[in-house]
């Protein structure tokens, strides 16, 4: 089995960026997804330009910050995106507004000069029932993989792909992670593990309720213990280039 450790939130804060780079250079992270239009975006781009082996995708924003378009249907009274707590309860989103905003973020990302590796989203917003089909079509248009939604799986990738958010919060630990991967090994060819490594900074503490835990993630993702365990169990670390958004491709 192969495993993709994808680090979310690239571009959120400098501490997040530095943690992701540390997890890439000294650990098992080979892929990340960047949030455009966020405070540490320029810093993230500068770092990415010096890391050719780090595959960078787009971390679509629909629950954080302000939109790039004038999609009034997507925001609250303050002009920011609908807060996370309210986002999932709404069922009145305009699919055209969703499409326009997502495309704007993709095009913004490409204009930064980065190669688009794949697409996912902050708080898994693209799995909202009104967002899912729209974002799926956009991923197909740009011919890049989309983090598992139920619409994209073996039929698209040509292999048994599985996404897991197990490595998060109270479940962050070496033993827990390895045991979880072993339960998946016989059933899947490629498993994506969501992760959030970071070096804690004041900006992160101010904008995220998930802050201190990120340093524990970083410690595990860069540990010799994890690298040895993966080799012991014949689990190969890979990146999102393993998944090609086209039928009949074998990623085994």
Swiss-Prot record:
| Gene3D superfamilies reported for this sequence | Glycoside hydrolase/deacetylase
Which SUPFAM superfamilies does this one have? Glycoside hydrolase/deacetylase
Q: Is Magnesium included in the keywords of this UniProt record? A: yes
The identity of this protein, by name, is Carbohydrate deacetylase
**Which key words are in the record?**
Carbohydrate metabolism, Hydrolase, Magnesium, Metal-binding
Q: So which cofactors does this thing need?
A: Mg(2+)
Job of this protein: Probably catalyzes the deacetylation of acetylated carbohydrates an important step in the degradation of oligosaccharides.
Q: Give the source's domain of life in one word.
A: Bacteria
Which GO MF terms are attached to this record? deacetylase activity; hydrolase activity, acting on carbon-nitrogen (but not peptide) bonds, in linear amides; metal ion binding
The entry's Mg(2+)-binding residues are 59, 122
Pfam families named among the record's database cross-references: YdjC
Q: Which InterPro entries match?
A: COD_ChbG_bac, Glyco_hydro/deAcase_b/a-brl, YdjC-like
Similarity section: Belongs to the YdjC deacetylase family.
